[in-house]
A protein has these predicted regions:
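Cys-based phosphatases of the PTP/DUSP/CDC25 superfamily and their flanking regulatory architecture
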Residues: 1-181
Length: 181
């Protein structure tokens, strides 16, 4: 879900006019992976562009390397491709990682950047929605859905294992207490 809040503030002891800050947040982007749908991310990028008035944009996520670099990378790569359509995504990723160590955490986020750049171009009328883009998007959604299901299954197994371990520990402690009495 996208959220936008606008704040005005004037720093104390500074004679400058007040600042206007737009805080945009996207709470549906899971950590270490990426959303299924590129549309909200592209909408957030377009909103950030429209609000910044050529002022700096600050981007952050909890760790500062995965989602933040993806978000920045989408806009950065889209601009680079518009300037020169011969740029290679892998070179752009290397460039991003030179600016932020370990930026973009794996193939899912890397693929999501591709999807979002293409979605930007589709929305801007540069690429058609039907055809290769739709097939690529469908493949991505299928792959990520399977990945998410596998991760959920692993988390469930891990949780069950921890419960069993705790139960075993409690039984062991309980039998030890009975023996010492």
């Amino acid at each position: 879900m996208l959220h936008c809040a606008t704040f005005g503030f004037a720093p104390r002891g500074v004679s400058r006019d007040s600042y206007e800050v737009h805080h945009l947040s996207y709470s549906e982007w899971p950590d270490h992976t990426a959303p299924l749908d590129p549309t909200p991310t592209v909408a957030l990028i377009k909103l950030a562009r429209s609000l910044c008035n050529n002022n700096p944009i600050v981007v952050h996520c909890s760790g500062g390397i995965g989602r933040a670099v993806c978000f920045i990378g989408i806009d950065y790569i889209a601009q680079k491709v518009k300037e020169n359509s011969d740029v290679k995504m892998v070179d752009m990723l290397k460039d991003l990682r030179n600016q932020r160590f370990q930026g973009v955490q794996g193939i899912i986020q890397y693929t999501f950047i591709h999807i979002c750049v293409l979605e930007l171009f589709v929305q801007d009328g540069i690429l058609p929605r039907e055809g290769k883009y739709t097939r690529f998007l469908n493949s991505y959604v299928h792959m990520l859905t399977r990945y998410n299901a596998r991760m959920a299954e692993m988390a469930t197994k891990e949780e069950a294992s921890k419960k069993e371990e705790k139960k075993t520990r409690n039984k062991s402690a309980s039998s030890h207490d009975k023996q010492s009495v």
